[in-house]
Amino acid sequence: MQTLRQIPSLMGKPQTHVAGEPIVALHNISARYNGRFALQDVSFDLIAGEQVAVVGPNGAGKSTLFKVIAGVLPNSGGTVSVAGSGPGTHICIAYVPQRSQVDWTFPVDVADVVMMGRIGRLGLFRRPKRADWEYVHQSLDVVGMSAFAARQIGELSGGQQQRVFIARALAQEAELMLMDEPLTGLDVRSQDDIFAVLDELRARGVTVMIATHDLNLAAERFDRVMLLNGQLLGFGQPEDVFTPERLVNAYGGHIRMLDTGDGTMIVNDTCCDQ
């Protein structure tokens, strides 16, 4: 499997955004979903090149946040800036949806799914050129899916499908990747495959936001964590964000923090109260 650093066509292009500078800036964002406020008064800056885990209970607004940043869903208040411009104006943003939102029965092969990432650069009615197909196959190689290029997307495992969608984002030449619960339903080996790809994205300087329900994984694997429940409850280092008070505010009384020999483990307590 090639690495991003071994692919000149993916690495030779200079960065559009400067590492260490904000690539995303939200100020007092509010957004509605299904007629109610899903986000209220959310503000933060995201530094180019970092990897951030967004956590919170179901209905916390994680997916809504990603859609607002990507320009898919309009905000009802506040301002969104992506690389200095409004949302929806950049093809450098890739949104990887939840697997449950994708129709995996649609008859399309893996290579064509990845080619969809080139549409923003091609335009809707232009045929892909040889260079575009090179991007497709190189992107599949990066995520270890070259051997599946002709396979129907619905025939793949959950982890393989997620890697194909990451390859689509690579073919798009995305510099900001928004991944909505890509680890949900995956076994440990498939999760490790995803994290290997994330390491390659880090080497390239791609900024990544991932929504996840696994607080321990968020604390162990990411530069910063964001705790969300309609409002921004905390954003920073895990030890500063995952405090008992904030976790209760986010999850109610169903979170327990256990001291272990290796640190603190956060447990979701779903048992009935005695």
Model regions: which residues?
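Catalytic Walker B motif of ABC-type/P-loop ATPase nucleotide-binding domains
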Residues: 177-181
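Conserved ABC transporter NBD signature motif
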Residues: 75-93
